[in-house]
């Protein structure tokens, strides 16, 4: 099948919003465990080598110089606004704190030591990054429950169960059982609501908006679109709030079973109106599954990474890519490596890491191939049109940034990469190979983790300042910083660490 230029308008039926109680799965950070283990073994080799909705109605616009294919539902009244920023200096209201996914907060102390403050056992595993809103830590579980905890001691302030998670027996494959809320929620200071997508029995994916003050559900709607099999699609990437909309990325289950096609769905924050959807124009796969979900710029445009698709020759199917989408999910621009077809065939695509937005209109991405790319956000470059390409590492998860310095979650150790004013990459330090978790930065310290230990690294040198064994951690979890505390999800709940 060849990818053709098309803009498909899908009339999302208003009945979707009224189906009521339904059923989702937030497919977060533990996808592809077998494949992740494979990349752990292949990563060093890569570095060595690199160093020497159905019922659619279709029209066909012409867009040059790229062939851009978009699938979007009609959305009425969507007005671009500035992207979300934290409500105050200590809040952490979305994945990696802001829509650029910097993962950086300046006003925190650098540690002499790390100590465990408390742990809370909840009703399921936590893959989503915790949020911090005022004096509440918001935690989402695979039990389909949202919790507000006291950051001082972990006491439950409120908890709201929004459905019954999907058991293993109802899933064709996967590696998170049961499946409940996997992707990181987002908080909207304008409405006071925390938004999450839950996978519930049925199956269906449900968007809920919960009052941060008391846990009351104020918004609830099904966010599966026409032609989408809820059993085959997993919602694991973080939600993004921009333009008065909640953007929801979908990929497939671990094992890539059944017929799924990567897509991003948008709902108005009030839960009203039709859904928007962009669907990758491939016959199968091309999941949008990376932990960070979509990044957003100041104009409300979205940047989302896409995994390998079914096409391995002929015309590009817009998989193995970075896509730039408008607030109404029309395809504006795209990038793919020149080797996209071979990367699709070998499952060494860009979809394992989220897009990183940098100053000077640059974008950084690395994935499973070991190559890092810098792109211009104003002209992503189409096929092979990068600004710079270098051997960086095999990367899974979300990178953190401080200005034009990037801290990349490499499977052989977090790596510092500096991008100059011309977009050229300069490789800096690299941490020990067991420190590979998606990093965040507080003050002058980078925090990352191994399978069971949190590490504090000097931002300039990568030297380990402090570490703490916190017990088993889920794959692709991301810590959250608030003041002198760090919060991280576990297989049974959440652990709080004190910076001392």
Language model region names:
Residues 1-9:
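Feature marks short, highly hydrophobic, charge-poor N-terminal signal-anchor/signal peptide-like helices
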Residues 182:
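Conserved P-loop NTPase nucleotide-binding/switch module
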Residues 57-87:
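Ser/Thr-rich, Proline-interspersed low-complexity disordered segments
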Residues 30-41:
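Membrane-interfacial entry segments at the cytosolic side of transmembrane helices
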Residues 15-28:
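Alpha-helical transmembrane segments
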Residues 87-90, 95, 103-124, 132-138, ...:
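Extracytoplasmic/lumenal domain signature
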Residues 49-52:
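C-terminal motif of bacterial Sec signal peptides marking the signal peptidase cleavage site
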């Amino acid at each position: 099948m060849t990818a053709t230029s098309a803009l498909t308008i899908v009339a999302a039926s208003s009945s979707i919003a009224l189906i009521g109680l339904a059923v989702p799965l937030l497919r977060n950070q533990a996808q592809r465990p077998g494949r992740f283990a494979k990349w752990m073994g292949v990563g060093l080799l890569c570095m060595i080598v690199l160093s020497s909705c159905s019922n659619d109605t279709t029209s066909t616009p012409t867009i040059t110089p790229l062939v851009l294919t978009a699938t979007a539902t009609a959305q009425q009244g969507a007005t671009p606004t500035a992207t979300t920023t934290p409500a105050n200096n200590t809040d952490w209201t979305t994945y990696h704190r802001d829509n650029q996914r910097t993962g950086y907060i300046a006003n925190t102390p650098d540690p002499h030591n790390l100590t465990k403050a408390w742990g809370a056992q909840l009703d399921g595993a936590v893959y989503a990054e915790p949020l911090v809103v005022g004096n509440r830590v918001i935690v989402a579980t695979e039990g389909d429950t949202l919790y507000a905890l006291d950051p001082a001691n972990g006491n439950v302030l409120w908890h709201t169960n929004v459905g019954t998670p999907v058991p293993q027996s109802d899933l064709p494959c996967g590696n998170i059982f049961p499946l409940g809320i996997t992707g990181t929620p987002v908080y909207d200071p304008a409405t006071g609501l925390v938004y999450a997508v839950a996978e519930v029995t049925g199956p269906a994916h449900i968007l809920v908006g919960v009052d941060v003050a008391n846990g009351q559900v104020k918004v609830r709607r099904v966010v599966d679109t026409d032609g989408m099999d809820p059993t085959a699609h997993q919602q694991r990437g973080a939600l993004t709030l921009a333009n008065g909309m909640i953007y929801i990325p979908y990929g497939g289950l671990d094992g890539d079973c059944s017929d799924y096609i990567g897509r991003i769905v948008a709902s108005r924050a009030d839960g009203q109106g039709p859904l928007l959807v962009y669907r990758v124009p491939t016959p199968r796969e091309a999941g949008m599954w990376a932990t960070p979900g979509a990044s957003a710029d100041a104009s409300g445009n979205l940047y989302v990474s896409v995994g390998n698709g079914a096409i391995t020759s002929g015309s590009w199917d817009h998989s193995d890519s970075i896509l730039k989408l408008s607030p109404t999910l029309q395809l504006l621009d795209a990038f793919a490596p020149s080797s996209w077809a071979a990367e699709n065939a070998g499952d060494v695509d860009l979809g394992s890491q989220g897009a990183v937005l940098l100053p000077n209109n640059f974008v950084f991405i690395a994935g499973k191939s070991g190559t890092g790319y810098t792109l211009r956000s104003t002209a992503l470059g189409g096929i092979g049109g990068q600004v710079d390409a270098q051997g960086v590492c095999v990367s899974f998860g979300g990178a953190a940034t401080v200005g034009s310095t990037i801290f990349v979650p490499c499977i052989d150790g977090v790596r510092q990469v500096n991008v100059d004013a011309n977009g050229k990459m300069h490789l800096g330090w690299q941490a020990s190979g067991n420190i590979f978790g998606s990093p965040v930065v507080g003050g002058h310290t980078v925090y990352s983790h191994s399978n069971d230990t949190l590490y504090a690294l000097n931002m300039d040198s990568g030297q380990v300042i402090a570490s703490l064994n916190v017990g088993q951690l889920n794959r692709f979890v991301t810590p959250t910083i608030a003041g002198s505390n760090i919060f991280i999800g576990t297989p049974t709940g959440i652990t709080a660490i004190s910076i001392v």
